[in-house]
């Protein structure tokens, strides 16, 4: 069995990763690390992980030593030195922060305030959106797992961008996320009394997923994508719903657009295109690795509207990381990820 380690295994994403990996038939969790909880067992932090008594938080180096592949569930800007060390020891790394989501160093510096530490590592890394980069992922040793909003928006518009069907400047992505998207660290915005029975936008036109979406869509763009992205927090635990407004270049037949989506994603194991007239919703995807898309046309205003939903903790984070692991290790891409969405 492949030995898999988790660096930063006690946050929401790390815990979700451990939960999913525990049901994977091709790997064994070799260890988890945490600077905050070193020496504590994972089931003392998450009692629902009762059967994982043997998983005790260790130092990063101990986990790296015993692992063939490393997941890094760390804050953005922290992973790169650890990845450099692990790659030198011939380990495969899947980083779930933003450290390897960009090829453009100036863009990364503008939005994250850091330069690349090891530029050659970035040259060889791959952006881990399977629906865009599957063939590159297969050959990579360093994979930058996409952001949750970025995954939802890109899967939503990839068929339109790649086929040149819409105006690529002026796309509007209006996105809503559950509170787990804000992470485990306490904050005013995620405090119960500030989010319960409320609904708010944040980082309006200033969210770090904007340049990530633009850079990676531009790999298939003909004109250069420019995006207005407005994220919102809603008082649910998990899930993202992205409503994406686009302007078709030419008069469209909505049935033909629907057919193009079905054709574009027909080989994708985790993308679901709803029939025309149906509306995608978070309950279509909760607790699953699926991205569910519905397609709508406002003929009065010539707006093609895409609604893209996913579970931000799974297809938006831990599940997509496991999907990337399956690809790079040559496993069935669906291994460990076949659970259907929860009904409610």
Curated annotation (Swiss-Prot):
Belongs to the NAGSA dehydrogenase family. Type 1 subfamily. One of its GO terms (molecular function) is NADP+ binding. GO terms for cellular component: cytoplasm. Pathway: Amino-acid biosynthesis; L-arginine biosynthesis; N(2)-acetyl-L-ornithine from L-glutamate: step 3/4. GO terms for biological process: L-arginine biosynthetic process. Keywords: Amino-acid biosynthesis, Arginine biosynthesis, Cytoplasm, NADP, Oxidoreductase. The keyword rRNA-binding does not apply. It holds the Pfam family Semialdhyde_dhC_1. InterPro entries: AGPR_AS, AGPR_type-1, NAD(P)-bd_dom_sf, NAGSA_dehydrogenase, Semialdehyde_DH_NAD-bd. SMART domains: Semialdhyde_dh. It is an enzyme of class 1 (oxidoreductase). Its EC number is 1.2.1.38. Its main location: cytoplasm. It comes from Clostridium kluyveri (strain ATCC 8527 / DSM 555 / NBRC 12016 / NCIMB 10680 / K1). PANTHER family: N-ACETYL-GAMMA-GLUTAMYL-PHOSPHATE REDUCTASE, CHLOROPLASTIC-RELATED, N-ACETYL-GAMMA-GLUTAMYL-PHOSPHATE REDUCTASE, CHLOROPLASTIC-RELATED-RELATED. The lineage of its organism: Bacteria, Bacillati, Bacillota, Clostridia, Eubacteriales. This is N-acetyl-gamma-glutamyl-phosphate reductase. It is found in: Cytoplasm.
């Amino acid at each position: 069995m492949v030995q898999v380690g988790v660096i930063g295994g006690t946050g929401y994403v790390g815990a979700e990763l451990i939960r999913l990996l525990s049901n994977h038939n091709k790997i064994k969790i070799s260890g988890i690390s945490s600077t905050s909880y070193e020496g504590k067992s994972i089931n003392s932090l998450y009692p629902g992980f009762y059967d994982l008594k043997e998983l005790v938080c260790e130092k990063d180096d101990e986990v790296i030593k015993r692992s063939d592949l490393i997941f890094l569930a760390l804050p953005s800007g922290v992973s790169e030195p650890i990845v450099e060390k692990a790659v030198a020891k011939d380990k495969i790394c899947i980083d779930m922060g933003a450290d390897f989501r960009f090829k453009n160093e100036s863009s990364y510096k503008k939005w994250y305030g850091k330069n690349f530490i090891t530029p050659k590592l970035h040259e060889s890394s791959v952006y881990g959106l399977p629906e865009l980069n599957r063939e590159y992922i297969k050959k990579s040793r360093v994979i930058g797992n996409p952001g949750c909003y970025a995954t939802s928006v890109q899967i939503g518009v990839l068929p339109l961008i790649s086929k040149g069907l819409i105006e690529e400047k002026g796309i509007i992505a209006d996105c809503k996320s559950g509170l787990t998207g804000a992470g485990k660290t306490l904050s005013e915005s995620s405090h119960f009394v500030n989010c319960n029975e409320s609904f708010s936008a944040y980082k309006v036109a200033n969210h770090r997923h904007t340049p990530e979406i633009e850079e990676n869509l531009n790999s298939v763009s003909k004109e250069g994508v420019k995006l207005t992205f407005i994220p919102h927090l809603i008082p649910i635990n998990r899930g993202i719903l992205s409503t994406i407004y686009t302007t078709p270049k030419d008069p469209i037949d909505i049935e033909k657009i629907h057919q193009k989506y079905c054709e574009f994603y027909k080989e994708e194991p985790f993308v679901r295109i709803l029939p025309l007239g149906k509306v995608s919703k978070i309950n279509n995807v909760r607790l699953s690795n699926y991205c569910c898309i519905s397609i709508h046309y406002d003929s009065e205003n010539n707006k093609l509207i895409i609604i893209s939903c996913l579970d931000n903790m799974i297809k938006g984070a831990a599940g997509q990381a496991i999907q990337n692991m399956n690809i790079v290790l040559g496993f069935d891409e669906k291994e460990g990820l076949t659970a259907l969405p929860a009904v409610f």
